[in-house]
Amino acid sequence: MALAGLMTLPVIAGEASEPTAGDILQGINMFTPEDGDPAYKVKADEKYGTQWAVDAAYGYWNTNKAISGTNRHTNLFLVHAQLNQRLIENTVHGGTWLRAEFSGSWGLDRRSAKSGTWFTDGYANASGLHADALGPHEGVIPELAVMQYFNHKRACVIAGMVNLTNYFDAVSIANDSFSSFTNDGFINTTIVPLPDSNLGAVFQYELDDNDYVMLGVSRTGCESGDNPFTSDDINGYVVVGEWGHIFADGDATFRLNPFYQRLDVDFGDDRGEHKRSNWGLAASIEYAVNDMCTVYSRAGLARHDHIDGNAGELSVGANIKLIPSREDDFFGISYGIFKGAVNNYRGYPAYLSDEDGESHGNRREQVLELMYSFQVNDYLKFVPHFQYIKNPAYRDASSESICGVQAVFSF
């Protein structure tokens, strides 16, 4: 499961009088102040080249339906932390940095802590509950890499064990780990494969003050939490690109993401390894309409020849400040349609049951999410939310609803 990154490329606010070289890449990679981030403080240890950010949360979810033998609710403690540590200082070109990331979730009661009865098994919607809800007791290191800047901070290479969600499709109003839309389909694209915990590299280049390009290459065989040097269950790779354009005086950002994926699948029998490939294109746009409203939209299509995932997606969303005097509070609403892939990599139709191979309805799942972020102070916020899911996981024509609340502590 792809993990959401804490820091994303912001829609550059109009408060910056004149953009300078490297501003775009700094917005993607570094933990810098940004509009709408009240928890950020200039930490004293930054003068030593240390940047860090931590989100810790309590999350409770309840569904109106659950598969027999699974729990209808869950209590989770979630953590997401990221670190940038400067290794070699170079004030002109940006220097050399170490990037590290940790993410995990733990069940807080007896049933939530058992994988066999865990909550997500009770509804199994295709786009997932939350990118950081990994399991009842699971903590992983999705990224540990070296970051090197060049050319007056206009170019950068990140190499090592990379988490591609930290760089690509970084729609800022939908990609915050705990504060915005909590369905995976709204946090990240469901079209572009964005693995974490895999060996890879990302190249970034700032073309001018309004345009940038990125190219990422990563293995795809290592699941979150596994050792990328020893995991070889599914050998493959993915190549992801991004062109981004900032316009409307910095209030809007458009992103275009082409990708190609290749897998060598070992079925574990006399058939041996089978090569599977996939390619597609996704795009997103976000726009700060005014001080009270920011909107976004994301769409994508994929070929999906025997590869797990979605073949199509279209989602729209908005963050709206309903109470002008509460500058840090906002109401979020998002709606998405996700089309299932024709086949997964083992050769079964992805919208069918691997066990019985029978059809369970159409291949379109629809998700509506409503949430409200209530900022208590600079460090604590409460986020109640509601999801309505039609045709969950493409397995039937029924619907489900999920209610939840998160208490998020950021520092």
Model regions: which residues?
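Outer membrane beta-barrel
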Residues: L76-T220, D308, G312-G347
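Short loop/turn motifs that connect adjacent beta-strands in outer-membrane beta-barrel proteins
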Residues: G14-E18, M30-W52, N84-L98, N151-R154, ...
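Outer-membrane beta-barrel "beta-signal"
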Residues: S399-F411
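Signature for the C-terminal beta-barrel architecture of outer-membrane proteins
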Residues: E18-D23, K153-V157, D184-V295, A299-R303, ...
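Transmembrane beta-strand segments of Gram-negative outer membrane beta-barrel proteins
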Residues: E18-N29, K41-K65, T96-A100, L108, ...
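Outer-membrane beta-barrel pore domains and translocons
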Residues: A57-W61, S103-S105, V162-L164, S218-T220, ...
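Outer membrane beta-barrel transmembrane domains
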Residues: E242-G244, A252, N257-K275, A282-E286, ...
